[in-house]
Amino acid sequence: MKIKTYKSSEINSCREASKITATILDELNNLISVGITTDEIDKFCLDRIKKLGGSPAPLFYRGFPKSICTSLNRVICHGIPSKDRKLEEGDILNVDVTTVIDGWHGDSSRMYKVGNISVKAQNLCNITHACLIESLNVIKPGSSISLIGKKIEEIAYLNNFSVVKDFCGHGVGLKFHENPSILHYYDKDYDNIKFVDGMIFTVEPMINAGKYHSKILNDGWTAVTKDKTLSAQYEHTVYINGDSVEILTESPNGVFYS
C-alpha cells in the first residue's frame, strides 16, 4: 500500500482549509437550537465556507446533494440535510464539514446537543469524544496503525458501547479520500502498516449505544443503526510532523467538545 506523505512546508493550504472547517464548526454552537432545520444548517455552512474562501468537498461528490453531512440521533454518518426535519429538544446531531482550499482538504465533525439531552445520550457523546482524543495519543512514526482501533475498542467496550465497522477514517490531502484506511476497530492485518512522518489522515470513530450493525437508507447515503439506537461521532484531521501530531482541525476557540 502506497501512503502519500507531505512536507510541512507544502501543506499550508491544508492547514487553512482545516482552520476554516474548525471555525465554522465553532460557529454552529450559536446556530444549532430547537426549531432549526438541517437544511438551514447546510446553507449556513455553505455560505460561510464560500465567504472564507473555500469550497465544500461533499457537494456533488459521487452524487451527494448537499455541502455538509448532518447525522441525527440514530444516523451514523452521511445524513443528508433536509427542509423537513426541525431539530427537537433532546436530539443529538453530528455535523461533518470538509473545506477545500487550493485542492487541499480539511475534514472534521462534531456532536451538537439540542437542549437537554438524556443521560445515555450525554454519556455516548462523552465516550465517543474520549475515543477520538485518546486514540490520537497512540500516533507516532513507526507505530502500527492498528493501535488506533485497539484504543477505540478498549474505551467503547469498557463503557458497553459498540464500534461501527462499516465506515472508517482515511488519508486526506489533495484528495478527499486517500490511503490508508484508518480502522476504528482492531484488525491484525493492519499491525504491519505503520505511521510515517508526513501523513495526513482523519480519525473519526462512530460509536453506537447498541449493536455495531448499520444499514443504508433508500437515499443511498444515510447510514443508520440497525437496532435504532443512538450513534455519535467526532472527527479530526491530523498531520504527523516529525515526532509530533498536529491536529489541523483543532477548535480555534477551544470548543471542540462541550
Model-derived features with residue positions:
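Active-site neighborhoods and metal-handling regions in enzymes and metal-associated proteins
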Residues: M1-S258
